[in-house]
């Protein structure tokens, strides 16, 4: 009799994706981040569900309900710290996962890549609406500033902002709908993840040398299931350490003050994982231009496959392109630093230079160097 795992309609799907999946034998630890992102999503949904049981999405009680969770609910402080810092780990894994895709040319699987970019945008939206929920000062003013950017849309901008706010300012209606969105989006993300995996399994995984690996495949289980398990243990250990020893390290002190529409914080800034995009937004002294640059900073990822000029897939054997890749990493770090700094000299000009470099690397320098490397190979 055939194994149930291989014949049962439901189990067969899981088996083909997680057990008998033919996997390149040489994929490195950089291929762990996909499963780590899955773990982050599951952990965020579970902790978020328990937080939602005690949270109230009303401006008069939201801040107090979060304090109540931390003080009075059994292990509420732990659940909240795991959820807040879990978001940081989610984005760390996301950036490393995208960086891996850029380095090894995984973006040439166009459907998988583009759904990945959509997933990235969805996770960013989820994190943004979630940051508003504790209704602290930075929650309120972050929501005000970022939603206000939509007023830059020609003709319909102001109506659009008021429609999202549900009134003439960020108020109770805004908080209530943001809670609804924050509850819904993770499930949309989970659905999109399934499509992401569906397209990935049409082609199979890429690998560090960027060559066809059909001749050298091994089953996912036990080899990579255990390798992923090691990654899980490392990440969960790091998350637990952060949540227990330094729970407020990455948060903003302003969020310990309840939201007050009459007092503006001296420096309005988002969570650390949005600072690079925020720096690009602020680098352009025009509202609509800034909003377009902000959108482009993420959507530029969608044109990467179109601008691939090299005859080789990854950067493994392309030192000049490797240099550009690490310049991009450094540039992202500089933008992250600038995003958290006040708008004054010399930060303004540093941010503008870093922003120009960011787009130049994607749109001009990388395709150019890829083309040059082809010429050098023929030489």
From Swiss-Prot:
Entry's cofactor comment: Binds 2 heme b groups non-covalently.
Keyword Cell membrane: no
GO MF terms, alphabetically ordered: metal ion binding; ubiquinol-cytochrome-c reductase activity
Compartment(s) of residence: Mitochondrion inner membrane
Main location: mitochondrion
Keyword field: Electron transport, Heme, Iron, Membrane, Metal-binding, Mitochondrion, Mitochondrion inner membrane, Respiratory chain, Transmembrane, Transmembrane helix, Transport, Ubiquinone
Mode of membrane association: Multi-pass membrane protein
Binding-site positions, a ubiquinone: 201
Recorded coiled-coil stretches: none
Signal peptide region: none
Note: Heme 1 (or BL or b562) is low-potential and absorbs at about 562 nm, and heme 2 (or BH or b566) is high-potential and absorbs at about 566 nm.
UniProt-recorded name of the protein: Cytochrome b
Gene label: mt-cyb
């Amino acid at each position: 009799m055939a194994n149930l795992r291989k014949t049962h309609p439901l189990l067969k799907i899981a088996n083909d994706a997680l057990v008998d999946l033919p996997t390149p034998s040489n994929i490195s630890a950089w291929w762990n981040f996909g499963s780590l992102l899955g773990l982050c999503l599951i952990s965020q949904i579970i902790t978020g569900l328990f937080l939602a049981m005690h949270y109230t999405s009303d401006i008069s009680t939201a801040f107090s309900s979060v304090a109540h969770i931390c003080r009075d609910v059994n292990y509420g402080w732990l659940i909240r710290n795991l959820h807040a810092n879990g978001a940081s780990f989610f984005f760390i894994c996301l950036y490393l996962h995208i960086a891996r895709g850029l380095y090894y040319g995984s973006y040439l699987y166009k459907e998988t890549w583009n759904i990945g970019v959509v997933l990235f945008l969805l996770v960013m939206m989820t994190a943004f609406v979630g940051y508003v929920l504790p209704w602290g000062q930075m929650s309120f003013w972050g929501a005000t500033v970022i939603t206000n950017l939509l007023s830059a849309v020609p003709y319909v901008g102001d109506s659009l902002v008021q429609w999202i706010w549900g009134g003439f300012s960020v108020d109770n209606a805004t908080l209530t709908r943001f809670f609804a969105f924050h509850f819904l989006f993770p499930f949309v993300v989970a659905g999109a993840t399934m499509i992401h995996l569906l397209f990935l399994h049409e082609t199979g995984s890429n690998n560090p040398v960027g060559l066809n690996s059909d001749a050298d495949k091994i089953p996912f289980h036990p080899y990579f299931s255990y390798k992923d398990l090691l990654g899980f243990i490392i990440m969960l250990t790091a998350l637990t350490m952060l949540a227990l020893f330094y729970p407020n390290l990455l948060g903003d002190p302003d969020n310990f003050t309840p939201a007050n529409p009459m007092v503006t914080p001296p420096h309005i800034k988002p969570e650390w994982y949005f600072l690079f995009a925020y720096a690009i937004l602020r680098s352009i002294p025009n509202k609509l231009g800034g909003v377009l640059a902000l959108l482009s900073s993420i959507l530029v990822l969608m044109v990467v496959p179109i601008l691939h000029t090299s005859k080789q897939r990854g950067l493994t054997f392309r030192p000049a392109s490797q240099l550009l890749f690490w310049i991009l990493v450094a540039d992202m770090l500089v933008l992250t630093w600038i995003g958290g700094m006040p708008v004054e000299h010399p930060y303004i000009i540093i941010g503008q230079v870093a922003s120009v470099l960011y787009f130049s690397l994607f749109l001009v320098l990388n395709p150019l160097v890829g083309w040059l490397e082809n010429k050098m190979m023929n030489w």
